Amino acid sequence: MDDYFDNIDSTELNLKYFTEHHESIYKAYEKYGQLVHKEGGPLDQKICWLIKVALSTECQYDHALRTHILKALSSGCTKEEIEHAILLVAPSAGFPKTMSGLLILRTILEESSNDSVH
């Protein structure tokens, strides 16, 4: 049973509970996230998502990283730009976190193209 919980992001485990028990807080949090992206400052969407890719790589939030990579791709970021954002993590946060982030990126790209990414 411990192995099962080791492989699940705690955010995923608690999100349903939180949204059911604190719906108005969650809605306000979602609204804040939307406003930060639209009105928070001069950064365009591509740059915002690249920053989020780097942050979630550094924090090892795999579920968030997967979401941020997909949103970066949909905002027009290239595979190379996303990979660069992940590579920038190594000097500050370590090589293992970067390797984990690259694996998640490669997995997403492989899933979307059904081809091996090298």
In which residue ranges do the predicted regions lie?
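Mid-chain, well-packed structural core segment of small domains
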Residues: 57-87
